[in-house]
């Protein structure tokens, strides 16, 4: 799968540096039976790859990921931008990387009938998807407030992208990667200043 092929062969990931990281890393996935977000602690990227895979398994597109007898899908269904969890964990400074531009408002899901049918055994998935736009928009308002109060530093695209959730056009993906890299580079000095402030 891409979760092994890319980091191990195509674009080797620096596993050694990650293993030396002193902080805590998490991935968030949605338990499709309970509808609750689950925050998996990531200690070893190779061993914990299914926890990462679960956090990015989109409804209708990906298979459910089974971990310890439970099934999971993308964390964005139940907690799209887990800043609140980070704050509750005691983090005073947070870096939030957004994939949408300032002013973006998520609209209601258009595939609800299909989602209800596909996840008939898991009604919480359809329920979450039905309210996802409301929760997402509330989270972005929370992020803006946290940014104003200095508890969050936000990196986001300057403009709307033209890349879909399941984009396969390599040139579009490369262009989006470059744009994201440039957006982060532009605010690097400001970010370093934010991190050094007490």
Where are these regions (language model features)?
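Patatin-like phospholipase
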Residues: 1-198
């Amino acid at each position: 799968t891409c979760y092994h092929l890319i980091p191990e062969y195509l674009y080797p990931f620096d596993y050694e540096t990650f293993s030396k990281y002193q902080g805590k890393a998490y991935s968030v996935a949605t338990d499709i039976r309970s509808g609750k977000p689950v925050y998996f602690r990531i200690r070893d990227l190779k061993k914990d790859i299914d926890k990462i895979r679960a956090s990015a398994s989109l409804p209708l597109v990906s298979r459910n990921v089974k971990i310890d007898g439970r099934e999971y899908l993308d964390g964005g269904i139940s907690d799209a931008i887990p800043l609140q969890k980070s704050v509750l964990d005691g983090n005073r400074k947070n870096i939030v990387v957004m994939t949408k531009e300032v002013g973006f408002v998520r609209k209601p899901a258009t595939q609800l009938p299909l989602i209800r049918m596909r996840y008939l055994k898991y009604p919480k998935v359809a329920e979450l998807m039905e309210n996802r736009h409301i929760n997402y928009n509330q989270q972005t308002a929370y992020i803006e407030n946290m940014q104003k109060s200095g508890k969050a530093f936000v990196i986001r695209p300057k403009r709307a992208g033209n890349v879909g959730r399941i984009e396969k056009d390599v040139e579009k993906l490369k262009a989006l990667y470059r744009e994201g890299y440039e957006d982060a580079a532009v605010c690097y000095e400001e970010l370093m200043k934010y991190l050094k402030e007490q």
